[in-house]
Amino acid sequence: MIGRLQQRKRLSGRFLRGLLIALLPVAAPRCAVADWQATSEALGRRMGQFSAYLDKAFRKRDGGFAGAKDKLAVIVAGKSAGTGFIMRVGDSCWLYTNAHVVKGVPAADVRATLLNNTVLQLGACQRAQGLDLVRFALAGPLPAFALERNVPDIGETVTVLGNSDGRGVVTEIRGHIIGVGPQQIEVDAPFVAGNSGSPVLNRAGRVVGVASYLRNCRDNADWSKSNTRYNGIRRFALRLSSVRWMAMP
């Protein structure tokens, strides 16, 4: 009985679809075809314009360069080059980067330049306990990122913004979170040297990590890694949500 009812429903559905297809040419007068085509083309153009507007608007909000360019700095410390970013904590603004970017260089010789060519005046330096992170105090209110306090999700879209290859230009690298730990996350965004200190942003434009290091995991002796992402280059970003900061002398 149930089988017959299902069969009748399928036949009824096919009949109605056929009837609609048969009636559509009759329902639309021939004289209206040209007007309909013109209207359709105009609508297509408007939809294209609207799509471009939405793309531009959302790129400012989804962790992209447009909404972040006034918060990024190119860092040069001796022979080292990397990335820094401004983030607000409470009422204070700090410039964050990796400790290895400025290692062995006096704070007075660290140069952090915003993309509008403003050189930041760096104040007191603090180092993260047990992590490759430092931050410098900044004076005055400045455009700044906010920290994402929630634990990120695997599969979440992220953007890495920074001084890729240390060539003095900021690039935008997109990818996803593919691993989450208490102190770091793993991403598939292909950042490289020079991106050390780059903010890793979620779609809301908040900081979920600091691009910090790559690990070459190629191991031909371990057959279990063959044809997996664990037998290649892996990329990690340090989380900031539970860092303990210590003053530097």
Where on the chain are the PLM-derived regions?
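Short conserved beta-strand and strand-loop elements enriched in small hydrophobics
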Residues: 73-75, 108-116, 158-163
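Flexible, gly/ser-rich surface segments that form the specificity/activation loops bordering the active-site cleft
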Residues: 142-195, 211-224
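C-terminal cap/linker of serine protease catalytic domains
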Residues: 34-63, 207-249
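Bacterial N-terminal signal peptides
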Residues: 18-27
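N-terminal secretory signal peptides that target proteins for export/translocation
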Residues: 1-12
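Catalytic-histidine neighborhood of serine endopeptidases
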Residues: 35-37, 43, 47, 81, ...
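A generic structural motif
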Residues: 93-97, 132-138, 185-187
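A conserved glycine-rich beta-strand in the N-terminal activation segment of trypsin-fold
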Residues: 58-61, 70-95, 120, 197
